[in-house]
Amino acid sequence: LIGSIISGYAYYHTGRDQYIVRRPEWSDMEYMIRGHFNWNWVNGDQISNMLIHWIDVFNWFTQLKPVNVIAYGSRIRKNIGNVYDNFSMHFEYENGVMLEGMVRRIDGCDNGAGIVIQGEKGSWHSSDFSIRNRNGETIWQYDPEAAKSKFKVHDMYTLEHIMLVDHIRKGTVLNIAETAATSALTAVMARESAYTGKRYTWQQISSSPLNMLPEQMALVNVDLKQFGVPLPGTAFIADD
């Protein structure tokens, strides 16, 4: 109904993450793990943490990989470890397909999450599960009540488990490792583009030696300077 996919718009806007007040008895590592929302080595920052779900949807629809991305981001709150609280990005995919993405975690703003898939003939909207023509007129509308009467199971999480158990019983392989890795790397390349202010390519990120893990994986005190806030336009991360 929508024809060949030419572009998409993905967004995820919500309030701020929880801030964990540090207790005196916590080591640096325990503090970061308990407040994992606020440290990029634990939660991956907002693109990998939130927008990735809609990136995954777009990748599934198109069955394409991104060629490159240019992104930017910043942080309004300063007491949130080393993560940003807003990002914006522009992906170029194979075959000239484009994806615009935005994610924000700031209180007091208008919120919402979803994706629009734009085709040559029309568009699909996750907000109301509708298909619209180029004039914006709805030409198809998902009917949840009709779906309930047609299918015995309609909960997506239950369907996932049914598919998994079905493959186990049949002795067949259910392997989504590549699709999961593709979506994860798509999110990471956008984050790294925003952190550095540089355009990132799929080749760069898929062969990158990037390792964000602490030097010592134990509940001990560490040098927190190694977890500085990324500063675009510089070769290294820097403190606020």
Regions found by a protein language model. Name each.
Residues 90-96, 118-120:
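Active-site beta-strand termini and strand-to-loop segments that position acidic
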Residues 19, 101, 126-127:
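Short helix/loop capping segments that flank catalytic or ligand/cofactor-binding pockets
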Residues 71, 91-92, 102-103:
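Short beta-strand segments that buttress and anchor functional surface loops
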Residues 1-80, 109, 113-116, 123, ...:
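Predominantly a Rossmann-like dinucleotide-binding segment in NAD(P)-dependent oxidoreductases
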Residues 3-5, 95-97, 170:
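Loop/turn elements at helix/coil->beta-strand transitions in domains of secreted/extracellular proteins
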Residues 49, 53-66, 70, 86, ...:
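C-terminal helical cap and adjacent loop that interface with cofactors, partners, or active-site loops
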Residues 99-101, 107:
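Phosphate/diphosphate-binding loops
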